[in-house]
Amino acid sequence: MLAWRPGRPDGCRAAGGRRYNPGHDCIKASVSLNSAARNAPAGSQPVKAELWKRVYSRVGSYWKGLVLAVLLMAGAAATQPTLAVIMKPLLDDGFSGAKPHYVWFLPLAVVGLILLRGICNFFSDYLLAWVANNVLRGIRGEMFERLLGLPDADFKRGDTGRLLNRFTIDAGNVTGYATDVITVLVRETLVVIALIGVLLYMSWALTLIILVMLPVSVGIARAFTRRLRRINRETVNMNAELTRVVSEGIDGQRVIKLFDGYDAERRRFDFVNSRLRRFAMRSATADAALTPLTQVCISVAVGAVIAVALSQANSGALTVGSFASFMAALAQIFDPIKRLTNLAGKMQKMLVAAESVFTLVDQTPEADAGTRALPEPVRGKVEFRAVSHRFPDADRDTVSAVSFLVEPGQTVALVGRSGSGKTTLVNMLPRFVLPDGGDILFDDVPIQDLTLRSLRSHLSLVSQDVVLFDDTIAANVGYGAGGTVDDARVRDALAAANLLEFVDGLPLGIHTPVGQNAARLSGGQRQRLAIARALIKNAPVLILDEATSALDNESERQVQASLERLMRGRTTLVIAHRLSTVQNADRIIVLDAGKIVEHGPHSELLAANGLYASLYNMQFRED
């Protein structure tokens, strides 16, 4: 009921009764929907400017580290042209023997400059990594905070792979590329400026030839920018699809094996994997083409420089040392320019990742307009008054004008055919689903007037789909108790849930890890652990959502005994599939097509020979 299950995208049903093709239908739909949603706002300049502002406002929070890193990068940049300048005295004076002290001075100068540059680069890189990781921690914190606050409906619509990618890949790309942009933009720009200054000082005529070709290189880079961004966005989408397919392959491995789904899963994976390869190759092609085109432009400039330099040398205006120094500075300028032209690709990747991250951060959180807390002592009285609800695009109400009262300590069971509205109705009590009409009252207080924290702190849940965390048994039992739970309370809860004997037989007892998805426990053990968790919370209202429907008879017997202890003195709403488990309920409410068609104790409903009797007799014959 309340669990988030990854699955195929909403609306992925084969039209006209056509068999669903997992290799194409849903993946194509998901990719096209993702692309349409993500492509729409990306091209506008205001959106890009806003993304830049949001990313670098977070980076700017660590301005002290940034300023120090920039100063260190300036120091490293200052050493770059100095190495080229040394070439002139080395060739003109050093080899001629005109200045003997150059024998030791020039080598030491070279070593000293390279050492200084290495120190500056190390500490600037360290500081930028420190900034990036702090920003990444903050962004992921924002994302997780928003994730926890999303409405339940968003999880049912969401794509697990896409969400995971936002945390693991996109968030890292935002901070990684953001600091890369700073590094390249500052360090390489300073290097280029310093080298151009040296080149102009050495020979303004030769330098002008180089400067003429720079706008051409920039124009080529801009031409590739838009294409790179579109390709990068599609690559992000396909990475999310690949994560989803692999995740479903892992989660559903038993079903795949038992239903011989190998070929279907291979088709799904190959379809996404092939598309991802195509997008990766398009991106690689664009990246690969950008560099040689830029280099061709620069090589034309170099050829012109050599021609002019030879002319000046023949007239005696240029020495060998001066030309070597000029060419050394010119050779050093190519890599910084290359990195600056490649910066466009990193900027686009950063913007695509930022768009993905802030799409999650900007999602509307769960509405929590209530201001009241439940008055103490909480009794556990629950009342539904003419409650109705219809899901978007549905042709009828899922719940229609349902009214009933549950007195404190009573047990009321909701039964009916699949799709009758049982789960939707119970989901309204913790406000996972909001009613379209009517009121729900908790101790005579409308639940919309209560804060979510106050409302949910007085509710406990035991469902068919037990969610346990990858932690110890004690941590899972004490989860939600509002503080540290001592071992004695944990053991008491486990004993009441008929699980203590099993836990004591484990090597680490209550401190035994349960593993991911509680894989080390059986279905019945997971259910009883959930019951122990509910006992520790000790909420006055309990929701049981088909808590025994997936268990064998022996496990059901043990769990049912534990549930009876849990239900004592608590208001309990039970959604039951096996009607044999609700015979002792104070009242049974029978739903059909979202409406109450019968209600009363078990014996009266059987005697009435209505829908409940029909469902009960059908199950009795099956059993």
UniProtKB/Swiss-Prot annotation:
Enzyme Commission identifier(s): 7.5.2.6
InterPro entries associated with the record: AAA+_ATPase, ABC1_TM_dom, ABC1_TM_sf, ABC_transporter-like_ATP-bd, ABC_transporter-like_CS, ABC_transpr_lipidA, P-loop_NTPase, Type_1_exporter
Assembly and interaction partners: Homodimer.
Recorded catalytic activity of this chain's protein: ATP + H2O + lipid A-core oligosaccharideSide 1 = ADP + phosphate + lipid A-core oligosaccharideSide 2
Similarity field: Belongs to the ABC transporter superfamily. Lipid exporter (TC 3.A.1.106) family.
Domain notes: In MsbA the ATP-binding domain (NBD) and the transmembrane domain (TMD) are fused.
Gene3D superfamilies linked: ABC transporter type 1, transmembrane domain, P-loop containing nucleotide triphosphate hydrolases
Annotated ABC transmembrane type-1 domain residues: 67-349
Membrane topology annotation: Multi-pass membrane protein
Lineage: Bacteria, Pseudomonadati, Pseudomonadota, Betaproteobacteria, Burkholderiales
Keywords recorded for this protein, A-Z: ATP-binding, Cell inner membrane, Cell membrane, Lipid transport, Membrane, Nucleotide-binding, Translocase, Transmembrane, Transmembrane helix, Transport
The ABC transporter domain, residue ranges: 382-618
SMART domains noted in UniProt: AAA (SM00382)
GO cellular component: plasma membrane
Superkingdom of the organism of origin: Bacteria
Protein name: ATP-dependent lipid A-core flippase
Top EC class of this enzyme: translocase
Subcellular location(s) per record: Cell inner membrane
Protein function: Involved in lipopolysaccharide (LPS) biosynthesis. Translocates lipid A-core from the inner to the outer leaflet of the inner membrane. Transmembrane domains (TMD) form a pore in the inner membrane and the ATP-binding domain (NBD) is responsible for energy generation.
Residues annotated as transmembrane: 66-86, 103-123, 190-210, 290-310, 317-337
Annotated binding of ATP, by residue: G416, R417, S418, G419, S420, G421, K422, T423
MF terms (GO), sorted A to Z: ABC-type oligopeptide transporter activity; ATP binding; ATP hydrolysis activity; ATPase-coupled lipid transmembrane transporter activity
